[in-house]
Amino acid sequence: RIMINSGETIDFSGLNSFVADKHSTGGVGDKVSIILGPILASLGIAVPMLAGRSLGHTGGTIDKLETIPGFNTNLTIADFKNNVERSGVCIMSQTESICPADKKIYALRDITGTIDSIPLICGSIMSKKISEGIDGLVLDIKIGNGAFMRSLSQGKKLGTMLKLSTETIYQAIQQSLHTTISTRQSRKGEISS
């Protein structure tokens, strides 16, 4: 609550639609947020996404988007709200005015070896998402090599600490990567069944 109250909150109650965000705990090759936001918006769901930069070895959603020339993720709250109202989806980077306490802690986690601290992860995720004024949240907890949650038990612990009542699908991050690579190679005729 202290991190939420350290800055402004956003009010989307004037929208005539369900307001949801998607957050990932991060992992190598994670691009789900970039794809899922527009899909949900096409279904009439308003999707304000307050996304993060890299922590540790993974690139954050904002880092990926900023590789596109001219793509602006540094928006005012008013511009953010206008974009969501106009197009149904908007992704912006964390600002000085939304959860500034979290922004400072987030930067410190990267240099203090506390990136994988589950209580700090919970506080960081939920303070930003509550500040967005959303009705629902899709939380993508990545597990396995290349993710912050190395094991299924760590992923479950994070979900439990977030007090999520969820429908859960567990799949290790390296499994989907292997399946994708195998499928591509099979199409090229490089792997036989």
Q: Where are these predicted regions, by residue range?
A:
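A glycine- and small/hydrophobic-rich beta-loop-beta segment
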Residues: 171, 176-193
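Glycine/serine-rich anion-binding loops at beta->alpha junctions
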Residues: 18-57
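A glycine-rich helix N-cap at a beta->alpha junction
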Residues: 64-90, 161-169
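Acidic, glycine/proline-rich low-complexity segments that act as flexible tails and inter-domain linkers
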Residues: 1-28
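Flexible, glycine/charged-enriched surface loops at secondary-structure junctions
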Residues: 9, 13, 137, 168-179
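General beta-strand structural signal in soluble alpha/beta enzymes
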Residues: 21, 47-51, 73-76, 91-94, ...
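Divalent-metal (Mg2+/Mn2+/Ca2+)-assisted nucleotide/phosphate chemistry catalytic cores
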Residues: 69, 81-157
